[in-house]
């Protein structure tokens, strides 16, 4: 095993990129270091940066497709090898970059036979296609394929809502706006005794719509913007123009609050742990999010059998989740959910003392 060496600052806090590469048009990698840091600071920064990289950076996706010739999402069209559902899934995977604000329209209008790829998307000049070779459909006959598209810039993810009215031929598409595919941090300590310092290593993978260095800059700026209000003096006598922004709070006594907290503390704790804190691989994370599993509480309300019913979920994914639950929370997920959450939470609480 070759031991890696990096040159770091010993006095002034500095960051630098120690590795950068483009594995493909849709996969960029970058590794960065920040040093010197006092004990504990690297973990604080690493956790905050990972969450900002995954959740605070905006991306551009196709969020809707429209064609009057499509009877329903799971139909097949004469002369096209793929089903409508497969075409929608291919559109979902198209990587875009833009400085778009809100939404805009785009379209595909092509005559077969031939392959339909991302380069056939007609979009405004401020929307750029990262990889023109991404496959959309295969036309086996001389037919016309015309699809209207809606492109949106946002952050996080957008789960499509069921649409029972297909008369307009419009179909929503799940969107994962996050341009950062994954982010990890690790810490290296050096020095002796009270002189110990830390180096933060930050690894970033992006989808090609921006570089890891650009992602790091955007995430840092977004974090700074979130903390700026705390730098201003608190306005004690705040006058609102009207009452529409005031929120009445229930008059709980301290005793009532304490009793309620004791009664529900395990459930509250589980609700407060979001699955993006568990360092899940992006594919597993996105599958869980699409199934409305956002917190550890949501996850524990499912059995291993339930997880296997999730679309695109594999037995390896369940094993990865079991490993993370055991490693970080000392919790096991039952193969079948035979007891309700309250009993499960109570048993977890009893085991933890």
From Swiss-Prot:
The keyword Transferase applies. Residues 1-234 are annotated as: Alpha N-terminal domain (alpha-NTD). One of its GO terms (biological process) is DNA-templated transcription. It is found in: Plastid, Chloroplast. GO terms for molecular function: DNA binding; DNA-directed RNA polymerase activity; protein dimerization activity. NCBIfam families: rpoA. It comes from Panax ginseng. It catalyses: RNA(n) + a ribonucleoside 5'-triphosphate = RNA(n+1) + diphosphate. The lineage of its organism: Eukaryota, Viridiplantae, Streptophyta, Embryophyta, Tracheophyta. This is DNA-directed RNA polymerase subunit alpha. DNA-dependent RNA polymerase catalyzes the transcription of DNA into RNA using the four ribonucleoside triphosphates as substrates. It is an enzyme of class 2 (transferase). Residues 266-353 are annotated as: Alpha C-terminal domain (alpha-CTD). In plastids the minimal PEP RNA polymerase catalytic core is composed of four subunits: alpha, beta, beta', and beta''. When a (nuclear-encoded) sigma factor is associated with the core the holoenzyme is formed, which can initiate transcription. It comes from the Eukaryota. The N-terminal domain is essential for RNAP assembly and basal transcription, whereas the C-terminal domain is involved in interaction with transcriptional regulators and with upstream promoter elements. Its EC number is 2.7.7.6. Belongs to the RNA polymerase alpha chain family. Gene3D superfamilies: 5' to 3' exonuclease, C-terminal subdomain (1.10.150.20), DNA-directed RNA polymerase, insert domain (2.170.120.12), RNA polymerase, RBP11-like subunit (3.30.1360.10).
